[in-house]
Amino acid sequence: MVLIRVLANLLILQLSYAQKSSEPIIGGDECNRNEHRFLALVSSDGNQCGGTLINEEWVLTAAHCEGNKMKIHLGVHSKKVPNKDKQTRVAKEKFFCVSSKNYTFWDKDIMLIRLDRPVSNSEHIAPLSLPSSPPSVGSVCRIMGWGTISPTKVILPDVPHCVNINLLNYSVCRAAYPEYGLPATSRTLCAGILEGGKDTCVGDSGGPLICNGQFQGIASWGSPNCGYVREPALYTKVFDHLDWIQSIIAGNTDATCPFVNF
């Protein structure tokens, strides 16, 4: 049985950060310092994830990134040489689609974090709006994060890396992972490059999938062979969770995602 790669990363103390590489995020390059003002670096219990600031007090990430003593770092580019406007917060409250925090490979891998206090917009910090419409298959999408830059071993970069991939038909992911019996319909998006070589990987969980400028997905899971041919990754579909997100932010903290019988 193929072991599925869950994108959250367990940091090992002996790991050293890569200074330079020709194989970032898997197939990308160092992000422009000004293109990821909304990108959060989420850490807890030695784990690393990404996240997306959606307003001054709320961050979206993946449910499987949940942990104790969560810290959310904003305004980060280089982890070794922090920006002067870097701001760090802790998770005041964490909300899940279901109170038990249950999620599957194809549903409910989403977590909404309320920060202990608001962040201020600055040169390197600004929220990303929620999507106004669902994405279309064929869209060009941007992925980013501080995840491993090697498909064969964990090498964590000092700076985030970015790459463009394509939004694929969900059926492509169903065909790629037959052993998991993915349902015919899902609240997840399938994205990658069929020829391989560009992908999220270990440590990129919870980071954004931005399609045609809109925040459409949250990095969830994929093949252990990051960037492998015809093995794209899956992303929680933000648009399908808008009612839940907006209800929680408005104060209806008992809101749950509607049940869908796949």
From Swiss-Prot:
It is found in: Secreted. SUPFAM superfamilies: Trypsin-like serine proteases (SSF50494). One of its GO terms (cellular component) is secretory granule. Residues 19-24 form a propeptide. Residues 1-18 form the signal peptide. Coiled coil: none annotated. Glycans are attached at N102, N169. Disulfide bonds join C31-C162, C49-C65, C97-C257, C141-C211, C173-C190, C201-C226. The keyword Protease applies. Its EC number is 3.4.21.-. Its main location: secreted. Expressed by the venom gland. The keyword Secreted applies. One of its GO terms (molecular function) is toxin activity. Residues 25-250 form the Peptidase S1 domain. Keywords: Disulfide bond, Glycoprotein, Hemostasis impairing toxin, Hydrolase, Protease, Secreted, Serine protease, Signal, Toxin, Zymogen. Belongs to the peptidase S1 family. Snake venom subfamily. Snake venom serine protease that may act in the hemostasis system of the prey. Monomer. This is Snake venom serine protease catroxase-1.
